[in-house]
A protein has these predicted regions:
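Nucleotidyltransferase catalytic core that binds NTPs
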Residues: 4-207
């Protein structure tokens, strides 16, 4: 039996309403393609393209993810994978997919990436092998970006297997949340109440 899993990775530092909207969109987007068995959230440990200086411990990030996804209609489909957190050194998508394939040998993976990541995708470690291990779908948050993405894929024939998903944008970022907390400002409009309470209770992001 083939198991269909969608993979959504990120720092989630912290998880916010934009992430939740996107998770719901990803779940709904897979329904016409036969649905999915699991939606794997993969928190990163030490992403190769970012500084880990302001990354809080994984235990806090995972706890906030669990609190945040409880209210989603697809909550029963969501699974948090610690596979990258358990690896040493930099986290690469290729190695993560190889490990996931070992865990789920019958798995068929759909990897979601941002449109900004797509334009740098050919710089990713073993990107061509990533395309062999998973169906890659690039998320564009604005309809106007779709043509730019389509043109990019047309010019780059080696990325022909990548498809595009348009998702309604929710303007919020983890950086914005961390800055607000550090300045003593409210974040109730950016994250679920349970996450805001957790951040306050644990004294996170206060600088």
């Amino acid at each position: 039996m083939c198991i269909r899993d969608s993979i959504y990775g990120g720092a989630f530092n912290p998880i916010h309403n934009g992430h939740l909207h996107l998770l719901d969109t990803l779940y709904r987007a897979q329904t016409p393609f036969g649905g999915l068995d699991k939606l794997l959230i993969v928190p990163t440990a030490n992403p190769p393209h970012k500084s880990a200086g302001d990354l809080i411990p994984a235990t806090h990030r995972i706890a906030m993810i669990r609190l945040a996804v409880e209210s989603l209609p697809c909550a029963d489909k969501i699974e948090i994978s610690t596979i990258e957190l358990e690896s040493r050194g930099k986290s690469y998508t290729y190695t993560t997919l190889v490990k996931l394939k070992e865990i789920y040998p019958n798995g068929e993976f759909v990897l979601f990436i941002g449109s900004d990541q797509l334009f740098d995708f050919q710089k990713w470690y073993r990107y061509q092998d990533i395309l062999k291990l998973a169906q890659v779908r690039a998320i564009t948050r604005q309809e106007c970006q779709r043509q730019a993405v389509a043109d990019f894929l047309t010019r780059n024939k080696d990325l022909a297997g990548i498809s595009v998903l348009v998702a309604k944008p929710v303007v919020v970022s983890s950086t914005q949340i961390r800055q607000r907390v550090a300045q003593g400002e409210r974040i109730a409009d950016l994250v679920p109440a349970a996450v805001a309470d957790y951040i306050q209770e644990k004294g996170l992001y206060r600088g």
